């Protein structure tokens, strides 16, 4: 990918680099802000930024999944960049206990890799905080929980909402079989919240910017995808089954098992969250039988 900067509105634009669309805001003649830092490590990103004679003052993290933080270390090293995320995200990646609670199906070695990945300082955004001011520029904070525990959207001073992974892009919503969300109920609430917003542009991870007129249709497609997945899960259940049995049935029944066990761990985790949501909404029953928890319709 050729690295380039695309202007959008006012001082807001985006850099196409590191396998992603990285939203940017120009703070002043010498400093910019990024929203997330890319899907892949890309040393060319720093070279590009230096070539235009600016530095990265801060990275606002929609969340701290590894496909959004790939260039944090090099930005800190080269520019002394501030990394800023919701407190719940910071705690999740710095605590084995929090990881165990959030990612019960993720392999221990993957959790250890996360702890090593985030062994740098991250500033926290607190619950209820409505904005963050960087230099003299105020960025509105929009809680969009669900994909992860502390997932946030950020509105640039020009009115561009950076949604992170709160909603799937048009391309992804067409092809995803089991998109990853840590809390399905919160994800649905966040998608519905997006319907109530009124911004001229929405920067989606990882490769698309949409205009306001296109968002309602995309939200409805996302909600329809989640409902279709829930119906598919319910249709795979005949007799009551354990969670492990149901997870395996969904993986094979929907044809979404991977060779990579790390990816299977994420998959098992998000299937488990969907089962929990179906129980919470009364569409699945949780049955205790012979000392085991089973799930039935």
Locations of the language-model features?
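Pre-recognition alpha-helix immediately N-terminal to the DNA-recognition helix
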Residues: 228-236
